UniProtKB/Swiss-Prot annotation:
Record gene name: piwil2
Protein name per UniProt: Piwi-like protein 2
Organism: Oncorhynchus mykiss (Rainbow trout)
Function according to Swiss-Prot or TrEMBL: Endoribonuclease that plays a central role during spermatogenesis by repressing transposable elements and preventing their mobilization, which is essential for the germline integrity. Plays an essential role in meiotic differentiation of spermatocytes, germ cell differentiation and in self-renewal of spermatogonial stem cells. Acts via the piRNA metabolic process, which mediates the repression of transposable elements during meiosis by forming complexes composed of piRNAs and Piwi proteins and govern the methylation and subsequent repression of transposons.
PANTHER family, alphabetized: EUKARYOTIC TRANSLATION INITIATION FACTOR 2C (PTHR22891)
Molecular-function GO term, any one: piRNA binding
Family of the protein in this entry: Belongs to the argonaute family. Piwi subfamily.
Amino acid sequence: MDPKKPCFPGLPGATRIPWLQQQAWGRGLRSDEPAIGRARGLMFATDGSASLGRARGFTTAGDTLLMQYGRGVPFPVSDPSIGFARGIPMPTSEDGGINRPRGWLLSTADPTVGVARGEPLLGLGPHLGQATPGQLAKQDLPEEMPSLQAEEEVVAKQVDMSTQGQGSSLVSMFRGMGIDPSKTWGRGGLPVGRGVFGAELQPQTAPVGAVAVAGPGGDRFPEDMMGQGNSFLGRGVPSQMVGMGRASMHPLGAGRGPTVPPTLPPSLHKEAHMTPGCSLTKGELKMEATCETLHKTGTKGTPLPIGSNHITIHCRNEAVYQYHVTFTPNVESMGMRFGMMKDHRPTTGEVVAFDGSILYLPVKMEEVVHLKSVRRTDNQEVDIKVQMTKILPPNSDLCIPFYNVVLRRVMKILGLKLVGRNHYDPKSAVILGKHRLQVWPGYSTCIKHTDGGLYLQVDVSHKVLRNDSVLDCMNVIYQQSRESFQDECTKELIGSIVITRYNNRTYRIDDIEWGKSPKDTFTMADGSTTTFVEYYSKNYGITIKEMDQPMLIHRPKERSKPGGKQVITGEILLLPELSFTTGIPDKMRKDFRAMKDLTMHINVSSEQHTHSLKQLLKNINTNPEAQTELARWGLEISQDILVTIGRILPLETICLQSVSFVTGADVSWSREVIRDASISCIPMNCWAIFYPRRCAEQAEELVSCFGKVAGPMGLRLDRPIRVELKDDRTETYVKSIHSQLTSEPNVQLVVCIMTGNRDDLYSAIKKLCCVQSPVPSQAINVRTISQPQKLRSVAQKILLQMNCKLGGELWTVNVPLKHLMVIGVDVHHDTSKKNRSVMGFVASLNSLLTRWYSRVTFQMPNEEIINGFRVCLLAALQKYYGVNHNFPEKIVVYRDGVSDGQLKTVELYEIPQLLKCFETFPNYEPKLAFIVVQKRVSTNLYSCSGDRFGTPPPGTVLDHTVTNREWVDFYLMAHHVRQGCGLPTRNISVYNTANLSPDHLQRLTFKMCHMYWNWPGTIRVPAPCKYAHKLAFLSGQYLHSEPAIQLADKLYFL
């Protein structure tokens, strides 16, 4: 790490990672005994001099209170300097020196704070964790960011001391849930976390002279000091205490929120907070504390009653009790552990959730309970120690996994069949005999803990199945192409998903085994051998009719148990006769009438959606067996869906060249854009149109219509160069276009009229015009322009699109932020190369947000997306400077294609690298807002009017109750819904130093949904995201390479 790197933008005196200022533990030694080099390396003199140990974990003498830094050691706060991480401190001046080998040195006039790997440490003294922001601002923290993987590994290693002491490698299936060692930064809201903090035993003071006790799993502490928390497992004796409990300790590590006021930008100082400390008496267990909510609610707009597909869950139990179970001598077998615990149900009760080491009960037992069992394999007596470690509130994140298990049992009781992750009702299937399909209605369910509490989220789901089995499909293929039967079957079936009706399980077809049949034998789990015919007859009562059919092969993904043992290996063979393909066939997708019949049953209205939800709730609440199952854990599900108050954002004003107007209730301005001039129109002086001979009439009519409708729209176009092709082969198009561009290099635009939906022809034209001979191109299907009554409307839309591709500007909305750059990013998977992905990047270049700069980067799975992101951002900033002669002061990034599980990666890795880009330009520190956009959400919103539910109007925003507790997020319904129910978009503010309040974020996002020029109305996502998606899709689906840089300042990909 280069010590000369500049400080973190906007954070005076601090470096890139403000959360490193929170208290944490490292790998050092105790503070109350003479310093001894116990870690790795040599000892240094303990005379209090400034020279210190250079490896990891060395101390100097001192009897003052110490704190550990990184992997280093505690140092007395009276020393002139402290070596951070692994370096050797050097003599320093008053303002502190720099540790040349690795790291920064901190001035010790300020309180020292542990900054190891982000794990909060309970106070080592009354004054710790109370440093003022002013004091912390003086410190120079390291710029190097800790690896996310490394942090997770540390947590995994330090989770359970007792189990490690026994040498067990088991990992709890609940371990790590809700436990987050890192801290968030730069969100622009109150940092708060999901960490489980709190109900641990009182940290015990380590007596002077105490030493670590060696055990099979490494150094550990005597029994009276042992905890199940992220302790100092074998890394030396801790300073003052040992953590009890499996999560970060109470209450300094509030999940992802700061425990010590970090050095924040001025805009964030108001929102930062500290979690108050609390003292515990020895042996006392307290209820896990609850987290404060983030400031995320806006005020702009008109209040509106909003319904959602969330159902309130009430917890009648006062608490859920967590116990740690220790087997002495150790029992490796998980099955044996479960069996032993089952023998003691009279003690633990019938309602348990046990994962092999952690036990959850709705009832409270003694703090420590000893049970006796006999291991049947060798008659060895086993002592089972059950020790209470935490008292959880019933709505704790740690309880949600087994609540979902309870919910799955309830759905089974109601007669619903589990297919994949959702539950369906085959008895209520809708048969579409004309199309040989059937639709199973069902539900997707999960229990979530949101800002409003514990909710059951239910969405209506449909499973489309074919009435014909895979064997029937094979017979049809055989009749059509006997010579290439096997090849055609492979093309048709490989990669498709099938369901086996006898067990309602789905499988992906990976291959076809032509050399095997149902008459072949296989070995069962017990070692016996049987044929497929006998197996299905004996186990399912199914008689196989076709004895010579081949077998379908499914290769399961490699999975392993927590202990690392493989679960499924080899291949699974399926019978085509018993397998039915799922999903909509490709041929049917292209059939408009068939899709119309199907969508009638799939795209249900808001009224039908809520009716289905209420029917499910009625079935649950009127079924005694289901109620009994829920009552075992004290759960009670409400009988109605959630209704709360949302807001409708103010309508926006659309600005054309000389006209501006407020959008209507349906947020559509298709009439205005064709009768008034666009902001900027590019004259089409030289353009060419290519068409096959049989489409000559349609081409002439289209050109004539262009001339009639262009005037009112402000467009001026000359007569085109007409090129009539002798046929419609791909080679004919490519050769003709290339020849024309060579002979006439000033061609502004290429228009191609094609017959049919031909991907090969479209791809060849786009490769030529986007990569080899860069020129904007427009592809038109002849069917689109074959209906005279619609030709005028079609011609107007095509002209608008052509104007965009040439660099024209259609409309804009008023965005009051000055010197703003808005960026859109999306990722698409390249179809030509397995696992290769392509990132589309689009950035605005002017204050009206009407000029755009675009780039594309490709990367393999082992490459980080940020590498290409950085290149694109630097190029966009340079282009922005070339247009405006200054850099943007605020940058707002809309990032699509990020799931919840990847949010931390974005926060901890992508954003710091983006901030590093700004250092390329001297004295440049822009404000940054990073917003993740999620389209695939299971939250539905409804407008409420009495007992009736409908579709919310465009501009509806909901920023509370159903939002996530960890992030500043909101749901936005920006588009007008004509069919189906309201599916909003979730927007998550991952980073915000741009002083953008929740109102600013929501209104800016809504404004950006008006800026997609391919549609005169609002769309679901901000326009930069949609542009980036179109660009990434074109590059990954058809180009398979980066487009020419000459087209980067045009929207050629629309």
